[in-house]
Amino acid sequence: MNKIRCALIGPGNIGTDLLYKLRRSDILEPVWMVGVEPTSEGLARARELGLKTTSDGIDGLLPHLEADDIRIAFDATSAYVHAEHSAKLTARGVRVIDLTPAAIGPFCVPPVNLAAHIGSNEMNVNMVTCGGQATIPMVYAVSRVQPVAYGEIVATVSSRSVGPGTRRNIDEFTRTTAGAIEAVGGARQGKAIIVINPAEPPLIMRDTIHCLTEDAPDVAAITASVHDMIAEVRKYVPGYTLKNGPVFDGKRVSIFLEVEGLGDYLPKYAGNLDIMTASAARTAECIAAAMRAGSPETATA
């Protein structure tokens, strides 16, 4: 059966790592890589792997969408330009998976709400942030047991894994992640903190999640829920590991994670980028399965 053809916008760290994952997919075929710098290493690497490339940005891709049957596009550029990209692509019937913090479309965290997005047939879904993909499943694991008044996450990532796009979007990162802690994670109030650690050798991504429950926490039920969710995330991010917890202190529930990447293009310590690209690939594969089946209800997370 024919694969669903895709374009990637942004040949940086995230776009290139995502390309490696898509090349392994049984249902997705990466066809185009889009950039703005003619001398970009990412564009050169994509050409070496057999993709068509353009350094003319989104406008260099648009004339080829129909001829190359591009059905899904991944935007791994910047929150500042995503709105333009999304408008031009969705107007031409292309589904957009947004890996920037722009959050034009609804948030998607695969083990929490991907199935609902497949059924609603949205043209744009937002993958929140790397910190959001790592921590929101844990907030939800608590909130599905009992109400969470406050959820706070701290994502600690290696400085080497944080490219210029992420650094420009730090404010958007914190706002978008906090919003998704509430909208997807189920906390009444959310807060997100990112720590960029310059240590050498680089440290693997570490995440700390604190939830304040409204009532005394159900220790057994929350513990079981957390372990179940860890298993769900590990289906597509094998390096997603519970290092400690859940730890209970009054109404506070604390969970400590480590996220190691697969090492496709990026080093294994860059689990923050790997969980983002793995989540985007999983989302696209489920959307593609629905496209092939011709019915949104046939694909599940």
Curated annotation (Swiss-Prot):
GO MF annotations, alphabetized: acetaldehyde dehydrogenase (acetylating) activity; NAD binding
One Gene Ontology term from the biological process aspect of the record: catabolic process
Residues binding NAD(+), per UniProt: S161, V162, G163, P164, G165, T166, R167, R168, N169, N272
InterPro entries per the UniProt record, alphabetical: Acetaldehyde_dehydrogenase, Acetylaldehyde_DH_C, NAD(P)-bd_dom_sf, Semialdehyde_DH_NAD-bd
Active site: C130 (acyl-thioester intermediate)
Alphabetized CDD domains for the sequence: ALDH_C (cd23933)
SUPFAM superfamilies: Glyceraldehyde-3-phosphate dehydrogenase-like, C-terminal domain, NAD(P)-binding Rossmann-fold domains
Keyword Transcription regulation assigned: no
Keywords of the record: Aromatic hydrocarbons catabolism, NAD, Oxidoreductase
Enzymatic class: oxidoreductase
Reactions it catalyzes: acetaldehyde + NAD(+) + CoA = acetyl-CoA + NADH + H(+)
UniProt cross-references to Gene3D superfamilies, sorted A to Z: Dihydrodipicolinate Reductase, domain 2, NAD(P)-binding Rossmann-like Domain
Tagged with keyword Oxidoreductase: yes
Similarity-based family: Belongs to the acetaldehyde dehydrogenase family.
The protein, known as: Acetaldehyde dehydrogenase
Biological classification of the source: Bacteria, Pseudomonadati, Pseudomonadota, Betaproteobacteria, Burkholderiales
Gene name tied to this protein: mhpF
